[in-house]
Amino acid sequence: MGRAVGIDLGTTNSVVSVLEGGEPVVIANAEGSRTTPSVVAFAKNGEVLVGQSAKNQAVTNVDRTIRSVKRHIGTDWSVAIDDKNYTSQEISARTLMKLKRDAEAYLGEDVTDAVITVPAYFEDSQRQATKEAGQIAGLNVLRIVNEPTAAALAYGLEKGEQEQTILVFDLGGGTFDVSLLEIGDGVVEVRATSGDNELGGDDWDQRIVDWLVEKFQSSNGIDLTKDKMALQRLREAAEKAKIELSSSQSANINLPYITVDADKNPLFLDETLSRAEFQRITQDLLARTKTPFNQVVKDAGVSVSEIDHVVLVGGSTRMPAVTELVKELTGGREPNKGVNPDEVVAVGAALQAGVLRGEVKDVLLLDVTPLSLGIETKGGVMTKLIERNTTIPTKRSETFTTAEDNQPSVQIQVFQGEREIATANKLLGSFELGGIAPAPRGVPQIEVTFDIDANGIVHVTAKDKGTGKENTITIQDGSGLSQDEIDRMIKDAEAHADEDKKRREEQEVRNNAESLVYQTRKFVEENSEKVSEDLKAKVEEAAKGVEEALKGEDLEAIKAAVEKLNTESQEMGKAIYEADAAAGATQADAGAEGAADDNVVDAEVVEDDAADNGEDKK
């Protein structure tokens, strides 16, 4: 059996770690660095370059160099190189293959298994695609683990057995996550998680690029975004300036021969960016981290004062403005400085690989699903089977029925989100369960089961209990959630809570009214000979009144019509009861000749008959 490693597959950089003698070790790559740029390039001679070598030649090979592919994982994105289309999984696999090779060179043996980390807010298709990238790279992916959870695992195990509440603030190159966890006695339990899949260090870099482009255009009248090589040089300069501003008050950006003017004279770019100006042009990006932070604290049901430790993860957390914001949000608590933000996630992944391979004992990792999952039921209602922040793996079942008589099939539509109305949430996928035996509505029993595995991947099964037929879907259709959609779901759920509640109540009134009409008519049909024509006419008139009210939007009119039908139904029930009682008394007189013993028996029979008709004799 080969070795197992932990891999942090990052947007900007990736890291691989392994357990040596039970202790995690970060493996340096062939170039001697402990982090490997997540950059892949296709040289014109056919060679595929990965890591620093790919990054070094990016300026002269712009169209054939791919970076930050993690932002496209799980989508239909692809890039054409030499008439061949490469998916995000294939590009990511190239980075994983280099990490695998470098680990094998260090260990002197094969690496076969890996735990790969993903942002906590990655949805199903992104997790599936990450797993596929690992498989393409020749790795058996033991587990997909959330990055903040892996970081907490690495941090928490060093702190001994004492119970503690840890906040992980993870701002990487392309994604942002914040998680609140409880750690103690070998158990790492995620209480809540939130994030933004479209916020990371790349966005800070882009703001510097935009600033430089604007400065150059105002000075020279030339738009550098039209020049691919110039733009690549700007990106690299922006990243260096951002890093420099973490330790200096200003950064000089000097790019000679950036382009030429109309007369072919070379032009230079020379600007100085102060830390204050950098923070000004990126303040809205920083502000976007506040909402997920507040959401996590709210969902976990803890106060900021109860947080024991704050762990910063991701190279972008080195920016002073980020550190200061985290300190402000946590009531002045200093973030932990003893953790390497670039390496801690890979270390946690290696520990989890050790747990799964039995090399690390007495450690239990309990992660959560970030958004609620459910199906659409009658009236467009979102019926949640699994609530957000539920510990995974988990499995939940609920039994539903048909809405129409002799309904041959049901359409199962799977949604993810927090709104009460299904269509306001994200449709993940749908499938049909057919072959339902003909039966009145309400009779078939359809059991719907949601199963989320330890990788956070969703499987949904629908089974007809009567026939045993079932159908299953694994949500992997690439219908990913953008962060805008996730933010909208959370905000809409709060802003429209009253509206959603009202719509749900209205639908329940309508559903109950329809059901009452159906059940009443069925009852009349079954007891037709016991009810007078006059009473049957009154009941039918009341039933039609409900149907007429249901055509409109007046909820009070529906309730009034239902009340009238209930009154007439009670009169009908009373008449049926009296008819049954009279029939029983006649039978008793004819067969018992007044014997007291027989009268007791007959009374019991009458009570049974009454009970069968839904009435209590007592």
UniProtKB/Swiss-Prot annotation:
GO terms for molecular function: ATP binding; ATP-dependent protein folding chaperone; unfolded protein binding. It holds the Pfam family HSP70. Induction: By stress conditions e.g. heat shock. The keyword RNA-binding does not apply. Belongs to the heat shock protein 70 family. SUPFAM superfamilies: Actin-like ATPase domain, Heat shock protein 70kD (HSP70), C-terminal subdomain, Heat shock protein 70kD (HSP70), peptide-binding domain. It comes from the Bacteria. This is Chaperone protein DnaK. The modification Phosphothreonine is found at residue 175. Acts as a chaperone. Keywords: ATP-binding, Chaperone, Nucleotide-binding, Phosphoprotein, Stress response. Gene3D superfamilies: 1.20.1270.10, 3.30.420.40, Actin, Chain A, domain 4 (3.90.640.10), Substrate Binding Domain Of DNAk, Chain A, domain 1 (2.60.34.10). The keyword Nucleotide-binding applies.
